[in-house]
A protein has these predicted regions:
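Residue-level signature of mid-helix packing/kink "hotspots" within the transmembrane helices
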Residues: 29, 57-65, 151, 254-262, ...
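Cytoplasmic helix-loop-helix junction between adjacent transmembrane helices
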Residues: 107-145
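Structural signature of the two symmetry-related core transmembrane helices
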Residues: 79-93, 275-289
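Helix-breaking motifs and short loop linkers at transmembrane-helix boundaries and internal kinks
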Residues: 43, 75, 97-102, 272, ...
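Extracytoplasmic gate region of multi-pass secondary transporters
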Residues: 31-32, 211-251, 255-258
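Helix-to-loop junctions at the C-terminal end of transmembrane segments
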Residues: 63-76, 261-272, 357-358
């Protein structure tokens, strides 16, 4: 399918990408919502369910830098954005129709690859479409839209299953197909290189210290956030909350993170990227410690959940922009590192803390999350700063396709 030739740049096209991001990420949390139903329908055990979640996480996170590097290669790769969101929706719809565990695994693999296709190239397109002076603000709109989508998917799926049943899951693919068409028609123009692209190995070799620093900070932040989001509802239930109330608490954490992303991006354009990242992370630590100190689910616990979500996830947006400005000649690859690989690494690190929670209870997990936030802020001081004007110099080798 040939893409429209008209150039699409500027902030107007960011709206299309933001809504597509919201739609794409709304499918990410549908699997946890479907698991109880799939366990009964297909006779899947808990261990097998855990492997399925790992399959999705691995395919969606660890392949993003590779797809991002391919999108930096100078060819017309905008197709990755619209095909990625379409594949995510179709795969999520197939989960409810899958007749056996093998079909579920194939659907999850396809959904993970759809997410991996969409994220790095779309983030690079947005970064290239907006003025540098307001890049933090517009990237925060784009990324926060995805964060707003996370709690929407399970809610919509719950209503759909309660009304129609699993057989009606095909309906959830419709928004993805509509947004895929809009991205194809109205999304930002692809970026084409006028200089020869570097190989994956050359990019890594030339930015080894920068990549190590950015991934370390991003993965540590993702670990802290994943600890809170994973154990927050479990801790609430252990303290007498209903499953519904625990889910609401998780939704509050996620939505607060989306709001924090918008605020963080706006502040970063005015106060500086590193300053906002460090202050946000240091400020998040006391609220993580407050979660650990609460024996009841009173107002203090709810406030701590909301503020920790806002600060932990607010810094995520600014970290993504910092990465893009540190490696402007590899926007797709660095977006894959910051939005995919780092989150995947952080998620994998949750398993050891689950063992700690089984032996010592869940408060130490929240203490660990706060400590990781402090460590992350300290690591940020070690990340090399990009040379002044680096983005503008590298951009001379790029042009709209």
């Amino acid at each position: 399918m040939a893409e429209p030739e008209a150039h699409r740049s500027g902030v107007s096209s960011v709206g299309v990408m933001a809504v597509a991001h919201l739609t794409n990420d709304s499918y990410a949390y549908m699997l946890p919502a479907l698991l109880p139903l799939l366990l009964g329908k297909l006779g899947i055990g808990i261990a097998a369910a855990g492997l399925l979640v790992t399959l999705y996480q691995a395919s969606s996170s660890f392949t993003q830098p590779i797809f991002g590097h391919l999108s930096d290669g100078g060819k017309r790769t905008r197709w990755m954005a619209w095909s990625g969101v379409a594949l995510s929706g179709l795969a999520a719809a197939a989960l409810g129709l899958a007749p056996n565990i093998a079909a579920v695994a194939v659907a999850l693999l396809a959904g993970g690859l759809g997410t991996a296709l969409y994220h790095p190239v779309s983030a690079a397109l947005v970064a290239g479409a907006v003025p540098q002076r307001s890049r933090g603000q517009w990237m925060s709109v784009y990324i926060s839209a995805g964060n707003f989508g996370l709690p929407i998917g399970p809610f919509v799926l719950g209503v759909l299953v309660a009304t129609i049943g699993l057989g009606g899951s095909w309906i959830i693919a419709i928004p993805a197909l509509i947004l895929a068409a809009l991205v194809w028609r109205l999304g930002p123009s692809a970026v084409r290189r006028t200089t020869a692209p570097l190989s994956f190995r050359a990019v890594v070799a030339g930015n080894r210290r920068m990549i190590a620093g950015l991934v370390s900070v991003s993965a540590t932040r993702a670990w802290a956030s994943a600890l809170v989001s994973t154990f927050l509802p479990l801790y609430a239930v252990s303290r007498g909350a209903s499953v519904v109330d625990a889910s609401r608490l998780l939704t509050l954490f996620l939505l607060s993170g989306a709001v924090g992303g918008l605020v963080g991006g706006w502040l970063a354009d005015r106060l500086g990227r590193d300053r906002v990242i460090i202050v946000s992370l240091l400020s998040a630590a006391p609220f993580c410690f407050l979660l650990a100190a609460q024996d009841t689910l009173g107002p203090a616990f709810v406030v701590a959940a909301a503020v920790s979500g806002m600060l932990l996830n607010g810094s995520f947006v600014v970290l993504a922009v910092r990465g893009q400005e540190s490696m402007p000649g590899s926007l797709g690859m660095v977006s894959g590192l910051m939005l995919g690989l780092s989150i995947g690494l952080g998620g994998l690190a949750v398993a050891p803390m689950a063992l700690v929670a089984e032996r010592a209870g869940m408060p130490p997990v929240f203490v660990a999350a706060g400590s990781l936030a402090v460590l992350c802020a300290l690591l940020m001081r070690l990340v090399p700063r990009p040379p002044v004007g680096a983005f503008d110099r590298e951009s001379r080798g790029l042009e709209l396709a």
